[in-house]
Curated annotation (Swiss-Prot):
Forms a complex with MAPK3/ERK1 but not with MAPK9 or MAPK14 in serum-starved cells. The keyword Nucleotide-binding applies. It comes from Mus musculus (Mouse). PANTHER family: RIBOSOMAL PROTEIN S6 KINASE. This is Ribosomal protein S6 kinase alpha-6. The gene is Rps6ka6.
Length: 764
């Protein structure tokens, strides 16, 4: 048996200044040990306490007795069925969609048809017995046993377990938010606040398992699910080990190799401490977008885990760096968490966490997954959800296999009490969003009418719903020119806000995406400005209040619009009341990403672009405030602050913005209050750090005391139409020069790496 891996920390003496860039050196790997293939061959010949150590699943005919740990797990257990309730069977569930598929079976979205929980949605994990080797069968039964025993707010709940002659069924919580891996693949990396929240909830889940004597052993983003609110739930217990404490340690070689602790790679005895190493790997990946130990193949990855020196990313906070160093201890006895979760909770990285509120799910998650109807699967891989859900007959397994799963059936004891609720039916499902399959379905459901607007990547048309004869608007986006996924997610997540355009349906034919929304019959704010020439101060303040209040809501959720302008702000009806305003066109909107919250991709409409975008210094929510400042200026003056007329070139407009030169004196400005000018000067401040936030704008006296503002329109000698329309006509003639195509996050090298190598360890 090989000795323990070296106990020194895996960090370089000199930290890396920039981590993960092409110019930085790769983590230094020291290959002074036997290669991993030799290690594995040696261990295949070794026995520890008479337990044969094999990495591959055993064949059907191999004696089960060679694995004592598996033999123990074949002891039949008492059937868990509440008195008076019948056992579940496949006929009691309607198959709705395929959520995932592996070599052993599928995961379906299902709806219960009978019983006290009729109408409830579940995830149904179906495994074919004939496809499972002996070790996999043991793992499946182990997963069922653990889920029966575990009851925790951050661990997926098992509601039913049953079997047929050829298949095994686990009926679990359906988590609409998908998994953390999917979110990480889309966003590449998370902010430290996001990571802190996920790690804190995960720490409580791991502690609960450890207190029950369970080592999880397969911690990775794919096994952490998000509910519709954004809280986590740990799932997939096929590799977990029951009844393991400091005196009774596990020896199995299992898990996803990139997340394995050194003692697991070395096939030495391991306990709960191994989970805290994997916890550190997960933290590192979420913060940096890359794995700390990943070679060109499995063997090199194992070598790196045992020997590699790794640079500490310097953009991480001191607290985050400290936690990583304490988790990445190659000696498990020295690893943070080896003495229990309390030492993890006491670490400075979690200083802002209220653990009691967290356990009660009273802490607001930093990210709310896109979700519409209860059975919406937008957060799941369309490769699976597009398939027709079909539970094919399973081949009968051997008699020995049936004996192995004796006592597999289970019904949650709280099933009647838990589901004294209104069943989910078509009448009470919120008709917000439905992801539909193709354009044929759109043409069957809607009749296209005239154009409403034409953009660089899309066209907006009026349409009529054939069944109800109700008018809607549809935005048709060319997927070859723009990735609409982020716009769809943001609209799905925040479309319930009264001042954000609501998304009704989404159709995708592969080339075009069709976004069906409300038809805004009141027209654009731009049209109203042109019609009135300028607003009274009271009307301008009322309009700015509604828009800024909506923007504040978006900013609090880490969303920036990045294209706020009068043509993207519409009235719901012809009353033109400020409360009927809705912000539309989220084509340039983004969720803030990165530890510093900055965005580096410039996209803008001239006149409404902040100066720091032009210099590509990165920008955050302050750019939206700049755009709102330009909007306020335009409402009060009837023209934009940086355009002199229709003959202005884009270069001239952008140069004036870069210089930050605008006038608040002379002409119409002699009739504008000092309060309005003061607010404008703060909203159009050149320095984004000194520019007002949305919250500060809302607290300004010109907003809070708007009922006292003048209601009359000031006289204006300016020709407003040409001045206001100039930037838009210029951009219409030169769309590509000032609206660069933004490549989706999936085009990044990190996202491509994830797409090429989808890590799996248990098949499902």
């Amino acid at each position: 048996m090989l000795p323990f891996a070296p106990v020194e920390d895996p960090w370089d003496q000199e930290d890396m200044e920039v981590f993960g860039s092409t110019s930085s050196s790769e983590p230094q790997v020291v290959f002074t040990m036997k290669n991993a293939a030799t290690v594995m061959r040696e261990h295949e010949r070794k026995e520890v306490n008479d337990l044969k150590m094999v990495d591959e699943p055993m064949e059907e005919g191999e004696p089960v007795s060679c694995r004592r740990e598996e033999l123990v797990k074949e002891v039949p257990i008492t059937q868990h069925v509440k008195e008076g309730y019948e056992k579940a069977d496949p006929a009691q569930f309607d198959l709705l969609k395929v959520l995932g598929q592996g070599s052993f079976g599928k995961v379906f979205l299902v709806r219960k048809k009978t019983g006290p929980d009729a109408g409830q949605l579940y995830a149904m994990k179906v495994l074919r017995k004939a496809s499972l080797k002996v070790r996999d069968r043991v793992r499946t039964k182990m997963e069922r046993d653990i889920l029966v025993e575990v009851n925790h707010p951050f661990i997926v709940k098992l509601h039913y377990a049953f079997q047929t002659e050829g298949k095994l069924y686990l009926i679990l919580d359906f988590l609409r938010g998908g998994d953390v891996f999917t979110r990480l693949s889309k966003e590449v990396l998370f902010t430290e606040e996001d990571v802190k929240f996920y790690l804190a909830e995960l720490a409580l889940a791991l502690d609960h398992l450890h207190r029950l004597g369970i080592v999880y052993r397969d911690l990775k983003p794919e096994n952490i699910l998000l509910d519709e609110i954004g809280h986590i739930k740990l799932t997939d217990f096929g590799l977990s080990k029951e009844s393991v404490d400091q005196e009774k340690k596990a020896y199995s070689f299992c898990g996803t190799v990139e997340y394995m602790a050194p003692e697991v790679v070395n096939r030495r005895a391991h306990s709960q401490s191994a989970d805290w190493w994997s916890y550190g790997v997960l933290m590192f990946e979420m913060l940096t977008g890359t794995l700390p130990f990943q070679g060109k193949d499995r063997n090199e990855t194992m070598n790196m885990i045992l020997k590699a020196k790794l640079g500490m990313p310097q953009f991480l906070s001191a607290e985050a760096q400290s936690l990583l160093r304490m988790l990445f201890k190659r000696n498990p006895a020295n690893r943070l968490g080896s003495e229990g979760v309390e030492e993890v909770k006491r670490h400075a990285f979690f200083a802002s966490i209220d653990w009691n509120k967290l356990y009660k799910r009273e802490v607001q998650p930093p990210f709310r997954p896109a979700s519409g109807k209860p059975d919406d699967t937008f957060c799941f891989d369309p490769e699976f959800t597009a398939k027709t859900p079909k539970d094919s007959p399973g081949l009968p397994a051997s008699a020995n296999a049936h004996q192995l799963f004796k006592g597999f059936s289970f019904v949650a004891t709280s099933i009647a009490e838990e589901y004294k609720i209104t069943p989910v039916t078509s009448s009470n499902v919120l008709p917000i969003v439905q992801i539909n399959g193709n354009a044929a379905q759109f043409s069957e459901a809607y009749e296209l009418k005239e154009d409403i607007g034409i953009g660089s990547y899309s066209v907006c048309k009026r349409c009529i719903h054939s069944a109800s004869n109700v008018e809607f608007a549809v935005k048709i986006i060319d997927k070859n020119k723009r990735d609409p996924s982020e716009e769809i997610e943001i609209l799905m997540r925040y479309g319930q806000h009264p001042n954000i355009i609501s998304l009704k349906e989404v159709f995708d034919d592969g080339k075009y995406v069709y976004l069906v929304t409300d038809l805004m019959k009141g027209g654009e704010l731009l049209d109203r400005i042109l019609k009135k020439k300028c607003f009274s101060e009271q009307e301008a303040s009322n309009v700015l209040y509604v828009i800024t209040k909506t923007v504040e809501c978006l900013h609090s959720q880490g969303v920036v619009h990045r294209d706020l302008k009068p043509s993207n702000i519409l009235y719901m009806d012809e009353s033109a009341h400020p409360d009927s305003i809705k912000i539309c066109d989220f084509g340039f909107a983004k969720q803030l990403r990165g530890e510093n919250g900055l965005l580096l991709t410039p996209c803008y409409t001239a006149n409404f672009v902040a100066p720091e975008v032009l210099t590509q210094q990165g920008y955050d929510a302050a750019c939206d405030i700049w755009s709102l400042g330009v909007l306020l200026y335009t409402m009060l003056a009837g023209y934009t602050p940086f355009s002199n007329g229709p003959n202005d070139t884009p270069e001239e407009i952008l140069l004036r913005i870069g210089n930050g030169r605008f006038s608040l004196s002379g002409g119409i400005w002699d009739n504008i209050s000092r309060g309005a000018k003061d607010l404008l000067s703060h909203m159009l401040h050149m320095d984004p750090h000194q520019r007002y936030t949305a919250e500060q704008v809302l607290k300004h006296p010109w907003i809070t005391q708007r009922e006292q503002l003048p209601r009359h329109q000031p006289n204006s000698d300016e020709p407003p139409q040409e001045a206001v329309a100039a930037p838009y006509s210029v951009l219409a003639r030169n769309p590509n020069r000032h609206h660069p195509i933004l490549e989706p996050v999936t085009a990044s090298r990190l996202a491509q790496r994830r797409n090429m190598k989808k890590r799996t360890s248990t098949g499902l």
